[in-house]
Amino acid sequence: MKKILYYSAILISCVLLTQSGVVAQVKHKPVLNHIALYVFNLEKSTRFYRDVLELEITPEPFNDGKHTWFKIGDYSQLHLIEGAKQITPHEKSSHICFSVKSVKEFIVLLDKYKIDRINMKGDSKSPTIRPDGVSQIYFQDPDGYWIEVNDAKL
């Protein structure tokens, strides 16, 4: 009888542990790990993201001269991968967005690097003001990928 109770307890424990693991997996939400951009000229793109967006370069495991990784959040990175055969056009609606304290101050930096910018409609260099009061501008990196910079309070 003691053996039956002992094995029953083990069986019930295993079932409960398995079920709790499944529940934990269902409750786990994915977190953004990285965004990868395929670039034509890694050196030029690296300078852009390092100098214009002032992103911090982080070590990458390949060390093959074809990758640059940047820290873009506590747990997220931007990966640049060299190998694109050409620069291709991209739609502005597909973009990466970074928030800054002041869009006006960021525009000064864009002007310093002679980087063209537009609003969401594409008809002005002035920032778009969203219905929630956030200012935003758009510009392109050396490979034509669109970037939004706004002053959203996170």
What is each PLM-predicted segment?
Residues 37-77:
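Core segments of cupin and vicinal oxygen chelate
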Residues 23-43, 94-96:
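N-terminal beta-strand motif that seeds the catalytic metal site of vicinal oxygen chelate
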Residues 67-111:
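Mid-chain, structured segments of secreted extracytoplasmic proteins
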Residues 64, 92, 133:
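Exposed loop/turn and edge beta-strand positions of beta-sandwich/beta-sheet ligand-binding modules
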Residues 1-27:
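Bacterial Sec-dependent N-terminal signal peptides
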Residues 41-43, 96-143, 154:
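Vicinal oxygen chelate
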